[in-house]
């Protein structure tokens, strides 16, 4: 599995702001979008392009454009919605595929409850977004669903990843690519990433 910890100074700065105990909902939400945007820029650097001729202001001109059916962005409900707009800033024509997975707080196991994928999801690059890769259970369940639907090319974007989640994801789906803004120390006894960001979903939506 390709693992990329994107160490751009802007990303480091923004993740640092998100770690603050007193970060506001407004700021956390904006920062999640901004970091998602920066991760998207990195994750799409290898997209294949093709040369086409268009009518320019002064006659025909050759340009490059992304080749093929392009992209579907896959936010994992609900926290993944906080990163979705960051992807769409760069790829506004992307189809949106939504997967609902929540984590049972007692067993820490993923529980699927919703799936609505693009009709041609198997022909698209799937960019899966979720702020936290903790145990990896929710992400693995989501990738299982995508592959069952015919998805062949998948990139995962997360704000913060735990080593335990990375290891589990690599064991289950070694053929995908992972892009993260930070790889943190470990999971605590409750399955939260340390130092982490806290509950990203609650911070994005302003709930507790």
UniProtKB/Swiss-Prot annotation:
GO terms for molecular function: GTP binding; magnesium ion binding; uracil phosphoribosyltransferase activity. Its EC number is 2.4.2.9. Binds 1 Mg(2+) ion per subunit. The magnesium is bound as Mg-PRPP. CDD domains: PRTases_typeI (cd06223). 5-phospho-alpha-D-ribose 1-diphosphate binds at residues 78, 103, 130-138, 199. It is an enzyme of class 2 (transferase). SUPFAM superfamilies: PRTase-like. Uracil binds at residues 193, 198-200. Keywords: Allosteric enzyme, Glycosyltransferase, GTP-binding, Magnesium, Nucleotide-binding, Transferase. Pfam families: UPRTase (PF14681). It catalyses: UMP + diphosphate = 5-phospho-alpha-D-ribose 1-diphosphate + uracil. Allosterically activated by GTP. Catalyzes the conversion of uracil and 5-phospho-alpha-D-ribose 1-diphosphate (PRPP) to UMP and diphosphate. Belongs to the UPRTase family. This is Uracil phosphoribosyltransferase.
